[in-house]
Regions:
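Soluble extramembrane regions of membrane proteins in the secretory/endomembrane system
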Residues: 1-145
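C-terminal domain-closing interface element
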Residues: 8-25, 152-172
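Alpha-helical transmembrane segments of integral membrane proteins
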Residues: 158-231
Length: 231
């Protein structure tokens, strides 16, 4: 209702928590985020994947960041997700918030703020205007980012590699190709099944409710998550 409070605002860093521990994930951006991510690259310890903003744009529910998006502001949204069982409960309080999570918030936000206030280019009100989204992910402490055109080239190279492998393996007819695809699909299903079974077993051992995308306080949850996303 009081939109004038946004006058002069050029970039928003929204910090929220949907849990009490774990890495601080940059999980949402404004649309056409190429220029927005130029500034995010200033962070010391990035943690983000381009699939998460795409997912949140499809969900009917909003976040604390939604009000800024509705007012056409650019920026990012950062949150922790582990310890979700504490969310909106009496345990959702500062005493239960992980010190490591707080540090990770700071490791991302402080360098961004310093870059924003010290780099003259960010005084330009149009600096964050862009017409495209980026593909991005973190690998270790490195923030990997490239354009959607580059992504299409990479997908084309993968397709060519598959065709080369088919030729190299002398798979020359449809029957053999289908057999090859079927065999590898079976391997994939077996791997997924084993990962799923192991996940349920560990949840049972730890006395926790099993969630396919969320295993709070489960031992080896990182290994399980890697198995799931690889498949």
């Amino acid at each position: 209702k009081e939109k004038e409070i946004f006058d002069g605002v050029n970039y928003v860093i929204n910090i929220e928590a949907r849990g009490t521990s774990g890495p601080a994930i940059m999980f949402e951006t404004s649309p056409n985020n190429k220029a927005v991510l130029d500034l995010y690259e200033a962070t010391d310890k990035p943690y983000s994947y381009s699939i998460t903003p795409e997912i949140y744009r499809l969900l009917p529910n909003g976040t604390d960041f939604t009000v800024f998006l509705e007012n056409n502001l650019t920026g990012i949204n950062i949150s922790v997700l582990d310890g979700f069982e504490n969310y909106h409960t009496p345990n959702d309080n500062p005493d239960n918030l992980s010190d490591k999570s707080m540090q990770h918030y700071g490791d991302q936000v402080l360098p961004i703020v310093r870059e924003f206030v010290s780099n003259e280019k960010y005084s330009n009100p149009d600096v964050f205007e862009s017409k495209e989204d980026s593909i991005f992910f973190t690998l270790g402490n490195q923030f990997i980012r490239y354009s959607k055109n580059t992504n299409m080239v990479l997908l084309a190279l993968i397709a060519l590699s598959i065709l080369f492998a088919i030729k190299k393996l002398n798979i020359t007819n449809i029957k053999k190709i289908l057999k090859y695809i079927g065999r590898n699909s079976l391997y994939t299903l077996v791997t997924v099944g084993l990962g799923y079974g192991l996940s349920r077993l560990l949840a049972l051992i730890n006395g926790r409710k099993f969630e396919i995308t969320y295993l709070p306080l489960i031992k080896f949850e990182d290994v399980i998550f890697i198995i799931v996303i690889q498949e």
